[in-house]
Every structure is written in C-alpha cells, then in structure tokens.
Amino acid sequence: MTRPHSFDPYLEPWLTSRVPRMAEYRAQLAEFREWVLTDVDAQANYTDRYAPPALETYDRHGEVVNRIVTNRWYEEQHQDLYRRGIIGLPYVEDAPHLLTFAMGYLLAQADISLHCPVTLTGAIAYVLATHAPDSVRQRYLYDVIRMDGQAKTGGTWATEQHGGSDVGATTTVAAAAGDRFALHGLKWFTSNANSGLAVATARPEGAPPGSSGLGLYLVPSHLEDGEPNHFRIRKLKDKLGTKGLPTGEIDLLGAEAIQIAPPPTGFKLMMEALEYSRVHNAVGSVGIQRRSLAEALAWARTRRAFGHVLADYPMVQHELLRMRVQFEAGALLAFEAAIAFDEVQQTSERRTWLRLVTALAKYLTAEWAIVASRSALELVGGNGYTSDYPVARLLRDAQVLTVWEGPANIQALELLRLLAPRYQGWEQYRARLKGVLDRLPDGMANLSHALEQRLQGDTEASRITLRDEQSSQSYARKLLHRLAQSLAFALLCETAGEAYLRGNSLPAHSAWRFYEELDPPAFGAENQAARRGVLELLDEPELQAVGKR
C-alpha cells in the first residue's frame, strides 16, 4: 500500500536513497501531486477543448495592444505554480534543483502546456543566477523567482525561420543603443510568447558568422516606463498539441534588450539554458509515460470484453508490462540527468556527464512518451480517440517532446562531440556502467552477465561509429539509441541490486524484462518468473487510482 504523503511509490524511495535530503519534501510533493491531478488536470482539459489562448492585436478603440489572452483558470494556476516554488525554491530556500524537476515530472502528468513555460522560466532564472552580470542579476532575477503570485514568466527565443537547431545561422541583429541593445529580426517559434522576460540570441553588428558571433540578450516585455517593448506578435501557431500554450512568431522591431553575454559566450550560455530545459523535457516525458500507464491500467482493470476484464488477457498484460518497465527505465534515466544537474552546481568536473546523460535521457524518454500515450489510446480504444478521455490529449501533447530542445539527430551530434577525446565522454559512460557491474550482488549473475555483454556491444558500436567521419554521420543516431537503452538497463540493474540486498526481487524482474526487450529470447522462451514478478507491480493501488480521476 502507498505510504502516507508518498508522491510516487516508485520514484520516491529511489530519489531519497540517492539524495537523502529529498525526504524533507515528501509531504510537499504529495500535496503538489494531489493538486496537479485534480485542479490542474481539470483546467488542462478545459483549456485544451474550450479556451485556448488568443491573440488580441487591437483594443476596442483601435489602438494596437498586441497581447495574448489566456483564460483566467490557466493564468491563475500558472502563477500558483510559481507561488508554490516550482522555480523559486532553489534560490529562495536553497532547495536542490532536483525538487523542482520532481515537481515538473508531476505537473507533466496533467498539463504539458503549463510545464513548458515553467521550464523556460527556470532556464532564464538559471542563466541570470549563474552567468549574468551583477547589475543584471540584481535587477531581474527576483522577477522570475519570486513566490508571491507576481512572478514574470520566461521565454527562450532562438528558433528563426531558417530552422530551429542551426542556431549559428541566426540572422537577428543586435545594434548598440547606449548601455543597451536594439534587436531586429524574426523569431519563428516562441513558446510562452506572452512571457514577461525572454532571452534571445542575436549577432552584434560586426560580429563574425556562426555561433561564435552570437551574444545573449534579455528582452523584457515592457520598458521601464511601462510601455510595451518594441516587438510585435505576428500570429499564434495552430499546433497539433499543447493547445493551451501560446506559441507565436515575434517580429523584433528594435526591441530594447540587455546584454547578458557578448560573443563568443552568448551561444555557450544559451546551450546551458538548453541543458536545463532538456532535463525538464526528460522528466516531462516520463510524466506522460506515468499518466499513460495509469490511464491504461485503470481502463484494463474495469473494462469487460468477451466475459472478462481486459487485464485478465495475456496480450493486454504483455502491453501493460512493457509500459510499466519502460516507465521505470525512463524515470531512472531522466532523474539520473536531474541529479547530475545538481552535481554540476558543486563541481564543473561533472559537466560532461551531465551533457551526455541529458542527451541520452532527452532522446529516449521523448520517444517512449509517444509510445506510451499511443499504447494507452489503443487500449482504451474508440473512447480514447475522443476528447472525453485524457489519452487523446496525452498523445497529441507527447509529439512535441521529440522536437523541443533539439530532435534526435541533434542529440546524436551532441553525443558525438562528447565522445571525442577532448571531453572523455566514453570514459565516463563506461565508468558509470562498470561501476554498476562491480556492485551487483553475487546472486544476480544473469543480470551481471547481460550487462557485461551489453557494455561489450556498446564498446564495439562506439568504435565503429567513431572510426571516421562517414561512420560518425551514418551511425550516430543508432549509437545514441543503443547507449540510451544500455544506460537505462544499467540503472535498472543498479536499483535491482540494491533491492536484492534488502530481500526484494521485484526490481530484478523489471530489469530482466527490460533486457528481453533489448535482446529478445527465442520465440516462446521468455522468462515467465520475470513476467509474473512485474505483474505484481501492476497491482499498485496508487497507480490505478490516477486513471480513475
């Protein structure tokens, strides 16, 4: 049974064992989760179906107002998130960033359209707190970390019409204007387009081409005298999902901006902001996995067909088992990145590992979120295809998670960079998996052998990929997929080993079940003990209750 004040029966014990301080926030997270899965979930459904944001260009007197109107429920909950400290706690109370990543994971189970602006606001807070000049930090940081219901929300403006990932080709120009800059250009895809503060990439006049010529600038929505800044929202995007999130095209018409970093540092700082956002993307993807599993399980436990509830049928059980084990693997992978983010705040020696694990986690969890939401919709059937059930929204919203903050090919290129000798990424990856291998108990020989074989295969795959430029370009994405899966398996093995020493064999069943997905046994030769073991996890009362709300 679920312990009182448990925010997640699977993740909570793992997080508190890795970061004991997280036990202090158990009740706070449990209350946050209850609010998210009731009030926020209801708002998300309402906003998605009936009250998405709208662009108001002129007021009733014909004056240009150029503002985005969101419904009051969305707006109130957006501010309530900041009031609850989803951005401010690490700065106001010195909480670990891991706490706010856990809050993001819970929030994503109900509303990705709120999780996105929270992520962007957090990225701005991080850049201001760690890299902005003292005068800029003192003037603007409080605006995004305050917890009194008056916080300004954030945006990151990098994508231009020529493409999102090729930031080095930025055409926005930053012209010096006294102690500030005037930005001219078009930002093509701006999430949370009604943000109070945004960071934008731009090229100062006379700067060289490419990413080395980019500076990073803070763009307030309003000037010091209260007048709107000099930019125009051209339109709101009509999107497949995240209907509650205002995403726009913004013309910068001499927008007043404050320099955070000149070239060549500007691009580097935007990439650090992306690191933060990619971790949130990963935990948000796992939130979608978790909610999809809950909806599928609740339906399977109650829906009857051909005289039996769906959950009694082996084919349905197989699908639920796969969803459960992939959720566990995704959760460990995403929060491995979240923990690494906090470690980097203590020592820069962990930055290569942060970048590497974040690329792996961002890629694989986003893929799995789509698989999980699609599986939930298929299991619920025709009802799931309607807006009366949340799985349709989950599926639509999940699609963007592979695109936000860099698609798979971009993560693969990041992996290639980190595996180069300069960064020692392969050595750190191998050391992490070898460390798990060395600590596995003697009674887990099967898992130990499987992980050792997996690491040997990773070594060969990396050698082939890195042998020359053509191989790197051909195999980078396949290597990304393989290493992400291997790391997820290693984390499952690590958790299983710790549980085994406490007399709990269920995590070992999950790890073996996951391994059988990576290296399928002969037809009909699946480990039935592992299958029965994971089935026990589907009896978790708390998990079933989510889907019944």
Write out the residue ranges for each language-model feature.
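Internal helix-loop-helix
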Residues: 59-150, 191-193, 404, 500-503
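C-terminal amphipathic alpha-helical interaction region
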Residues: 439-549
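Extended, charge-enriched "interface" segments that sit outside catalytic cores
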Residues: 1-93, 543-549
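C-terminal helix-coil-helix/basic helical segment that borders enzyme active sites and/or dimer interfaces
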Residues: 328-362, 377-378, 463-474, 494-500
